[in-house]
């Protein structure tokens, strides 16, 4: 069953469809903590095993997890990012994709934790400045990004832990900005196109 990863009600509806099929076991790509936990608690009460795919929520205690270690991934991203930014970088941009007041995915959250651990350890004097964009506010992205860059004219290195680095990459293309360096995640089509055009430097 498929669901919209950014909409809790979509996950809940898919979970109900799964429940109606009386499964022997379930493979789950978790959504936010609350809706995932509620579904998994029902599975546990019926002794139905489940595993997590792509994104882990260890406190829910799945039978297994298959996917990337998001904390280590964020730490690794910090290392690669700063190899490019250089030791003299004093301020960098972290773009966050938000949904209903929180980071839109657990992966983003854990990757950021790993990244900040690396930055605190090795580059404590480098300021991480956040640009938070609402998932459902795409019409306002252009003005928000422009205002941010006007306010922080010294920022040239950008990173995001969601799969939508293209939000910045396409902005750079539209506005002919060639002196920015952008790191992101996931080989989605629009990210790949920005990589080819040179407005994304690196994808994990």
Model regions: which residues?
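An alpha-beta-alpha
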Residues: 78-122
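Flexible loop/hinge segments that line or gate small-molecule binding clefts
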Residues: 35-72, 188-197
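Structured C-terminal subdomain patch of bacterial secreted/periplasmic proteins
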Residues: 198-204
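Short hydrophobic segments within beta-strands
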Residues: 53, 95-97, 159
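Amphipathic helical "hinge" segments at domain boundaries
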Residues: 1-13
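Hydrophobic alpha-helical segments within soluble ligand-binding/sensing domains
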Residues: 66-92, 142, 191
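Conserved acidic residues
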Residues: 24, 63, 156, 201
